[in-house]
Swiss-Prot record:
It comes from Escherichia coli O6:H1 (strain CFT073 / ATCC 700928 / UPEC). InterPro entries: PLipase_D/transphosphatidylase (IPR001736), PP_kinase (IPR003414), PP_kinase_C_1 (IPR041108), PP_kinase_middle (IPR024953), PP_kinase_middle_dom_sf (IPR036830), PPK_C_dom2 (IPR025200), PPK_N_dom (IPR025198), PPK_N_dom_sf (IPR036832). Its cofactor is Mg(2+). PROSITE patterns: PLD. This is Polyphosphate kinase. The lineage of its organism: Bacteria, Pseudomonadati, Pseudomonadota, Gammaproteobacteria, Enterobacterales. One of its GO terms (cellular component) is polyphosphate kinase complex. The keyword Nucleotide-binding applies.
Amino acid sequence: MGQEKLYIEKELSWLSFNERVLQEAADKSNPLIERMRFLGIYSNNLDEFYKVRFAELKRRIIISEEQGSNSHSRHLLGKIQSRVLKADQEFDGLYNELLLEMARNQIFLINERQLSVNQQNWLRHYFKQYLRQHITPILINPDTDLVQFLKDDYTYLAVEIIRGDTIRYALLEIPSDKVPRFVNLPPEAPRRRKPMILLDNILRYCLDDIFKGFFDYDALNAYSMKMTRDAEYDLVHEMEASLMELMSSSLKQRLTAEPVRFVYQRDMPNALVEVLREKLTISRYDSIVPGGRYHNFKDFINFPNVGKANLVNKPLPRLRHIWFDKAQFRNGFDAIRERDVLLYYPYHTFEHVLELLRQASFDPSVLAIKINIYRVAKDSRIIDSMIHAAHNGKKVTVVVELQARFDEEANIHWAKRLTEAGVHVIFSAPGLKIHAKLFLISRKENGEVVRYAHIGTGNFNEKTARLYTDYSLLTADARITNEVRRVFNFIENPYRPVTFDYLMVSPQNSRRLLYEMVDREIANAQQGLPSGITLKLNNLVDKGLVDRLYAASSSGVPVNLLVRGMCSLIPNLEGISDNIRAISIVDRYLEHDRVYIFENGGDKKVYLSSADWMTRNIDYRIEVATPLLDPRLKQRVLDIIDILFSDTVKARYIDKELSNRYVPRGNRRKVRAQLAIYDYIKSLEQSE
């Protein structure tokens, strides 16, 4: 079998994941408004795909052509374009289907040609009061540099200003960052109808109000368009430049980076399309997509529910971990010192972590706090707690990852604010991102320093903790806390030798330990001992690790994979991966936690990790995986994994064809894993 047939291209696997998101929009068992929101998630994901993965492929093609190498990347480009086009056609059909379904529920998303006289008058007033101040046309002249002017991933209206045989062009930015994209209109009879209009169509209706008095014209025509830029940046190293200065400079570079995708309304006149292509320097390698009347469907993630409660998911109230509420504990430190605590979001509330850091900020016994931030919420209470701690005389160290893609600007802001408050802020070395999720609190107790650590799979972010599944381990176990302390020392001195006995730390020992653990399962299988590997990951694309899993399967080791996103491994290849089962789950929460389980001859090893099985996470980032040393917590994670693999509603097979076939239920009972996990955790908390 040729080597290329052993792996699925990661770009195609990623698109297959996004097609699973589109399946959720098509799933009639999902509430109507949630289906509309899944269209927004699909669109947002696709934007990121073009910014990152497509842009990277484009760079590879240009380099390979300059070197005269093979055309594999160009062939892959064609397959990507074909797959995206097919999915976009399905997207358009689903959108129209959902509009009809909303109308049946008395929700009407109307356009500028469907307005009543009363609504027309109301819209002109709305435009003058709320919208006009945000609208400034960009006139397209021979010397206009649109690459410089246009914002990444914003929708624009390209306007024809027609006077006799002369046509001038202008662009209008749709300011959805300043004015809501969805505007409720005054109801008409019957009163139960709830009309809405998109911001795009308000501008279309008010074109006269924008251009009248400045241009003579016979007609104005508007067509939507959007451009996506390459999200990469170069860190140009200068002796005197700090990393923060380099990142600030690089972000400005991203604002004018080359376009990689141009989407336009398919009935836009050819002459206008060509003007825009030329002005945006769209090359033959870029994605040029004729689309519908509307772009930036990512705003549909926040599609409002103006109808009945059953049009959205039934809320699942976040659960408190009852251990923290025990009467014998004066504070969170007492509870954690008594025993390790495991939180699983979004089923558990993130409030416990926020409260622990708040307590640490003023507790007289706390000496020092160290934490690393990768992506935090816009109004982060964690940042506030670190500032309060510094004001209260604690020694506070915050490791800020300035290279967190799409959060760089926010993190530069936080770094400046923390520094001004007297917090010791440190950054990763360029090219070595810190993706671990750690904090360490040092506390004076009975004359000794006791340390409390957090090791997690997700970010310290109040918002995403309501949407992403992630674990937080809170522990005072010195075997773990001492090694978390070493990780922070390694971050501050990345070139000083350091060793770990319990933690798996990238880039120090992760690859070696993972290889050793897979090889141990192979040896156990060959000796007739219990063997098995179970992995829950966002992405599995590192070829070295994929090959190790193939070797395990060939040796008779059962391998169970739950991979949300990219998976280069192909299950069920005869003689290679017969013993590998791979599924993916897409549901109301984004599956984000990473779990590694090794049978280990009957004494299971269970790790929670910040790292996916990607080369960058294993070799080029600081990542941390922790073993669960408490048998009670280990069993809890094993139970949750069992529930996930028993899903008969939202689980799909990962296969060579990228078919996204649902796992058949057969005669098994109906299990929707995320709802079952909620019930499982709720029962645990009630029995504590």
